[in-house]
Amino acid sequence: MEKSMYNSLKSILDKYQELNQELLKPEVLSDIKLYKKFSRELNSIKSISEEFSKYLNYEKTIESSKIILAQEKDEELISLAKKEILECEEKMSSLVEELKILLLPKDKNDELDVIMEIRGAAGGDEANIFAGDLFEMYSKWANNNNMKVSVLDRNYATSGGFTLIVFTISGEKAYSKLKFESGVHRVQRIPVTESKGRVHTSTATVTAMPEIDDDIEVEINPSDLKIDTFRSSGAGGQSVNTTDSAVRITHIPTGIISSSQEGRSQISNRELALKILKAKLYDHENQKKLEKVGQYRKLAGSGARSEKIRTYNYPQDRVTDHRINFSSSLKQIMEGKLQIIIDSLLAEEQAEKIKEVGI
């Protein structure tokens, strides 16, 4: 292992051990915000620290075996020591390659939960129904992975599904697993109302944004906000509340809009709408920064939310992700077995990073 790599790993391991000690301190245990901050830092370097610890243990074993070789006369012990050295060297060589991968640049938001926004797009009623199907797909995936789904806002469509639904998925590295879902999802199928059996094409747009926690500052000037209230509506568009409890917030400088009617009061809806707005503004700034330094990768495509990323072909029972030219069973994917696509996308991301840093 190169000395520079060894020193980097040693610094990370020292930090990991330091954070473990910090998390045991009473002042940290009593401060939820600080505890969450340290826990997130710890989790972000846990894997690499554990693998480097294994490397160091193999290093110590080799040193001990070399002492045996230098001092022992017994041929059997010498043979065992040589064998152990060879085995440890092989394992260390393998670990070096793993550690190179773990040292690759990481998205600072990967540890966060995710806010998903799905909108029915081209195709009228069928697009809205498909938006509902996508929500069910992500909900089933979350359930399969012991993650929690919480709806922040939704507008029911008259023929089923949603014109818009916004929800969080909370769980281990939720954003890292769903960040490549942003883009246009296209569906090809025969609508229930189609009498001639023709296949229709419709689309829904998905936006995946990191959920902002207390550690991340998003500056919002109250004077930049336009806040409107309106009555909550349910399925079919009927009013479900006699008071103006739903809240819509417009960020005037960017034109970004967020809303919520899921809460039981205007106050709770305002908090939810503000939560969505913060995520949108944070995501907006991140997109601008990436665009400025030209860091869009193949998986992010052009960075445009209008880019078609996936097709769901019902007649052929096939889902195709166009960015990696990967196809899978539609039935399984819609049942929430999305991990096969997620893993393929993450593998492609890793390959791109390796190419960039020249490993």
Curated annotation (Swiss-Prot):
Give an example GO molecular function. translation release factor activity, codon specific
Give the main location. cytoplasm
Give a single Pfam family match: PCRF
Kindly give the Gene3D superfamilies that the UniProt entry links to this protein.
3.30.160.20, 3.30.70.1660, 6.10.140.1950
Report keywords, A-Z. Answer: Cytoplasm, Methylation, Protein biosynthesis
PTM notes = Methylated by PrmC. Methylation increases the termination efficiency of RF1.
GO cellular component assignments: cytoplasm
Claim: Chloroplast is one of the keywords in the record: no
Q: Does the keyword Protein biosynthesis apply?
A: yes
Q: Where in the cell is it found?
A: Cytoplasm
N5-methylglutamine modification, residue list:
238
HAMAP family reported in the protein's UniProt record: Rel_fac_1 (MF_00093)
Biological role: Peptide chain release factor 1 directs the termination of translation in response to the peptide chain termination codons UAG and UAA.
| Family to which this protein belongs | Belongs to the prokaryotic/mitochondrial release factor family.
Quote the protein name from its UniProt record: Peptide chain release factor 1
